[in-house]
């Protein structure tokens, strides 16, 4: 019934395309009129549109004219005319949806339409790409169009200094990577002066390869961190011991003879010790003198040893060189499992990166303490409007809609797609599969057909390369090790009988043109004459026709990826813009996807039925593969959804802290803010010793006096005052405490330089808030890692997490207020000698903070070494008395730690 209705009225997607086609007709009707405009008249349109917006007109009304303007500018500056389907794509993006456009349909050009329209508001447009190369390339390619129309274009890449970043963000349209935009947001919320912040408002963002960024990278939060204590000796110790542990094939074994020391869960990438393994590692640690004879690993004080052990166990059993990471310049570089790209600067958390460094014998860098973090899911939700482009979003439409509220619209191709997709061939072993791939390649290049082979890992690409070399078949390899040659290798991939082996092609961003890339060939000529160019074109046309006759580009997949979307991205490299093309996947029952997620019984039956070199290639196996991929996609979706649910708790807190911090940063004078905080602190302190509504017998006035003296340098004899006038009630005493704190502060600052005091107050607020937020993030991490254990007590871990995270947050805010008022209460007029010493201490403290920020920026390759900041000239202030640390005995004499007594204001 549903299919019948769809045949009559069309699918939702078809109805949408039909609806926006009317807008396209309107844009097309304007084309003759805009063609008659002079360059100056066309350029003046930008000013006209901005005036109309200022007078109350909305962007939707301007769309047909604005798009017609961009199309005409494209024709005049780039000799590129936007197709009708590209106009549809632009409308979809403007409406805050995801446009699924096939490879070769010109997504880069499409983005110019909504980018120009939305930049007319003056609030800026961000265009996100997956790497620096594409950000620079796309900005350079399209800058002629934007600049012709009076729009400024900026690019954010890794090696820019803060001033260059600020200028790029101030442009009408800014290109850059998701990482750069995210890290700049975090760094802006760590700045100590408004001028240090580089970003402005987050208005409208267009995300290229939106599925890769919002889905594949959603599980990896952006983290800015500083180094903690060095524990390299512990990693080296466990790295030496772990290889002695034997792997058990599965979690449950039938008899003791099969039991080994540990087993792995490849789905979750975790490794677990068995009881036998615990006993074995305990004995080894006792021999090493790390554990006492009567000690055991289960003891609470050995939890850190378990941390090192688990990290090293995972490093040895689950993470492989040239598959999950490579070693480059004596550093571990992670490989993106979705794109096959190296990701320098990224590090695994939970000690895993250090464990892999120990395993590979490179320098072990200290574990980091989180200073600021955010997931891409929550970062992009900060924008007023999100839009995205990709070649393969339809399979992830549900997730994009449920998490981001993004609707996926499939854009028709400009020309019919005529790619031939062959059935998968499945072999019994990996070796048989690779042999079959080599034979297929040999046959195809004999007729002049170019071949692109997609592999899931560097290791697979190198194995295949070795086999091709033995057969003397010329080929190029593109993986994380050869990323510098990427553009030139892809430019050659469409040549007749050319063979290219590449790890996952997602995000490569360069079209493979049949016969080779003509523009690249012409660009390589030095001072070419018209005759030279004509000859190159003639040769290219011959090659182009020859490749088409041979069947176009053939895509060979060496295995299925966990996600159908990644397979579709690989397939999508063939048959662009109506060209012919083919695709075929080769699998073996030993491939990770089938080995981990397909049923074991089915795998055994297939292997048993296949003789050496034989393969299966028919319908039911496609269903098996599709079912296995569906399991993986569902599993990963649940992980991402779970991550978001937990991160939303921290995200709410992050918004509160960052908004509060920004108000501190922007305020010229924070004295009113501090006055309000002093009132809160006085009330909190008072009720710590005088419970609200309690009888006099429960009052601890002596303890309150001690706290006032030790934390606020205030001598106030409350007991004497009460004895002299027993009519004093709770409210009267509270008022006395509040007034004493206020008067003491006014008295101590009235003779100080007001500018220096204001500066010191602002810095104290920012530094104290940062310190407490950082400690809070660490506490939240510990809570998150242990909260699932609540399930054993029949409690919902998520609800428990929300409740305890809120309690931690409330306590953190109280502690922040208390500490900042306490520190400001300990300033006094200093002697000249003390002034010089105070200035030196101040500069050292500022240096520590800057070094902390520098270490973070260095970790992410974003530091401008030439930039030097002048230390604030605060000469008249210094702390009186030593600072009480959180774990020191509380000065009030209670016998408790400070953090459990006066640091904690309920």
Swiss-Prot record:
Membrane topology: Peripheral membrane protein
Residues annotated as binding ATP: 86, 104-108, 511
A GO BP entry: protein targeting
Cellular compartment(s): Cell inner membrane; Cytoplasm
Top EC group: translocase
Entry GO MF terms: ATP binding; metal ion binding; protein-exporting ATPase activity
SMART domains found in the cross-reference section: SecA_DEAD, SecA_PP_bind
Entry-linked NCBIfam families: PRK12904.1, secA
UniProt similarity note: Belongs to the SecA family.
Functional summary from the UniProt entry: Part of the Sec protein translocase complex. Interacts with the SecYEG preprotein conducting channel. Has a central role in coupling the hydrolysis of ATP to the transfer of proteins into and across the cell membrane, serving both as a receptor for the preprotein-SecB complex and as an ATP-driven molecular motor driving the stepwise translocation of polypeptide chains across the membrane.
Name of this chain's protein: Protein translocase subunit SecA
Gene assigned in the entry: secA
């Amino acid at each position: 019934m549903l299919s019948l209705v769809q045949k009559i009225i069309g699918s939702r997607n078809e109805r949408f395309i039909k609806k926006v086609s009317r807008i396209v007709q309107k844009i097309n009707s304007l084309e003759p009129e805009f063609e008659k405009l002079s360059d100056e008249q066309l350029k003046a349109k930008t000013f006209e549109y901005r005036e109309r917006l200022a007078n109350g007109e909305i962007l939707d009304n301007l769309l047909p004219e604005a798009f017609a303007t961009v199309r005409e500018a494209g024709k005049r500056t780039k000799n590129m005319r936007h197709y009708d389907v590209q106009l549809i794509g632009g409308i979809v993006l403007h409406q805050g949806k995801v446009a699924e456009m096939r490879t070769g349909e010109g997504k880069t050009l499409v983005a110019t339409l909504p980018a120009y329209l939305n930049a007319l508001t003056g609030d800026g447009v961000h265009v996100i790409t997956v790497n620096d190369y594409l950000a620079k390339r796309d900005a350079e390619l399209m800058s002629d169009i934007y600049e012709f129309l009076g729009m400024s274009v900026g690019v954010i890449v890794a090696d820019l200094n803060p001033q260059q970043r600020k200028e790029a963000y101030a442009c009408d349209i800014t290109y850059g990577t998701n990482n750069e935009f995210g890290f700049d947001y975090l760094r802006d919320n760590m700045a100590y002066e408004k001028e240090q912040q580089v970003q402005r408002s987050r208005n409208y963002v267009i995300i290229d390869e939106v599925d890769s960024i919002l889905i594949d990278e959603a599980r990896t939060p952006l983290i800015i961190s500083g180094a903690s204590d060095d524990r390299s000796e512990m990693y080296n110790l466990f790295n030496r011991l772990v290889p002695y542990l034997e792997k058990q094939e599965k979690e449950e074994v039938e008899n003791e003879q099969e039991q080994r020391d540990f087993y792995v869960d490849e789905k979750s990438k975790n490794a677990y010790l068995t009881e036998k393994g615990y006993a074995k590692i305990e004995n080894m640690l006792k021999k090493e003198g790390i554990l006492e004879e009567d000690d055991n690993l289960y003891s609470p004080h050995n939890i850190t040893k378990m941390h090192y052990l688990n990290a090293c166990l995972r490093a040895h059993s689950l993470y492989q060189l040239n598959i999950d990471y490579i070693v480059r310049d004596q550093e571990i570089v992670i490989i993106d499992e979705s794109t096959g790209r190296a990701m320098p600067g990224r590090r695994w958390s939970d000690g895993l990166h250090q464990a892999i460094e120990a395993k590979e014998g490179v320098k072990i860098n200290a574990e980091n303490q989180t200073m600021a973090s955010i997931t891409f899911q929550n970062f992009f939700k900060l924008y007023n409007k999100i839009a995205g482009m990709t070649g393969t979003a339809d399979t992830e439409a549900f997730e994009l809609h449920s998490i981001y509220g993004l609707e996926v619209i499939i854009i028709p191709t400009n020309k019919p797609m005529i790619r031939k997709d062959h059935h998968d061939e499945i072999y019994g072993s990996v070796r048989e599969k690779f042999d079959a791939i080599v034979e297929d390649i040999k046959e195809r290049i004999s007729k002049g057909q170019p071949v692109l082979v997609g592999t899931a890992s560097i290791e697979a690409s190198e194995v295949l390369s070795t086999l091709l070399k033995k057969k003397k078949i010329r080929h190029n390899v593109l993986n994380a090790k050869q990323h510098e040659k990427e553009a030139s290798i892809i430019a050659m991939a469409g040549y007749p009988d050319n063979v290219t082996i590449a790890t996952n092609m997602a995000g490569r961003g360069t079209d493979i043109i049949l016969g080779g890339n003509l523009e690249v060939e012409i660009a390589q000529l030095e001072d070419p004459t018209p005759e030279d160019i004509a000859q190159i074109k003639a040769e290219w046309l011959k090659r182009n026709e020859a490749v088409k006759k041979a069947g176009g580009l053939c895509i060979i997949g060496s295995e299925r990826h966990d996600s159908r979307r990644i397979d579709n991205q690989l397939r999508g490299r063939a048959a662009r813009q109506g060209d012919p093309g083919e695709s075929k996947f080769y699998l073996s029952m030993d491939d990770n996807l089938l080995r981990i997620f397909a049923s074991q019984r089915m795998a055994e039956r297939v292997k048993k039925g296949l003789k050496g070199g034989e393969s299966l290639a028919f319908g039911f196996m496609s269903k098996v593969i599709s079912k296995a991929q569906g399991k993986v996609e569902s599993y990963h979706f649940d992980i991402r959804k779970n991550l978001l649910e937990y991160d939303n708790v921290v995200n709410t807190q992050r918004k509160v802290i960052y908004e509060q911090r920004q108000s501190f940063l922007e305020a010229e004078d924070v004295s009113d803010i501090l006055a309000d905080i002093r009132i809160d602190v006085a009330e909190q302190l008072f009720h710590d010793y005088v419970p609200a509504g309690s009888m006099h017998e429960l009052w601890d006035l002596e303890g309150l006096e001690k706290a006032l003296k030790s934390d606020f340098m205030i001598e106030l004899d409350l007991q004497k005052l009460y004895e002299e006038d027993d009519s004093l009630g709770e409210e009267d005493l509270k008022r006395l405490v509040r007034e004493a704190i206020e008067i003491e502060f006014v008295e101590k600052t009235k003779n100080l330089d007001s500018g220096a005091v204001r500066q010191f107050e602002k810095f104290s607020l920012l530094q104290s808030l940062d310190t407490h937020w950082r400690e809070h993030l660490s506490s939240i991490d510990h809570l998150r890692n242990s909260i699932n254990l609540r399930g054993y007590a029949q409690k919902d871990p998520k609800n428990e997490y929300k409740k305890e995270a809120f309690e931690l947050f409330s306590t953190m805010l109280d502690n922040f207020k208390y500490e900042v008022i306490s520190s400001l209460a300990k300033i006094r007029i200093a002697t000249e000698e003390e002034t010089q010493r105070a200035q030196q201490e101040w500069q050292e403290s500022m240096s520590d903070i800057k070094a902390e920020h520098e270490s973070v920026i260095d970790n992410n390759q974003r530091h401008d070494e030439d930039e030097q900041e002048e230390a604030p000239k605060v000469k008249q202030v210094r702390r009186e008395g030593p600072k009480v640390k959180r774990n020191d005995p509380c000065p009030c004499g209670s016998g408790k730690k400070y953090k459990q007594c006066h640091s904690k204001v309920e």
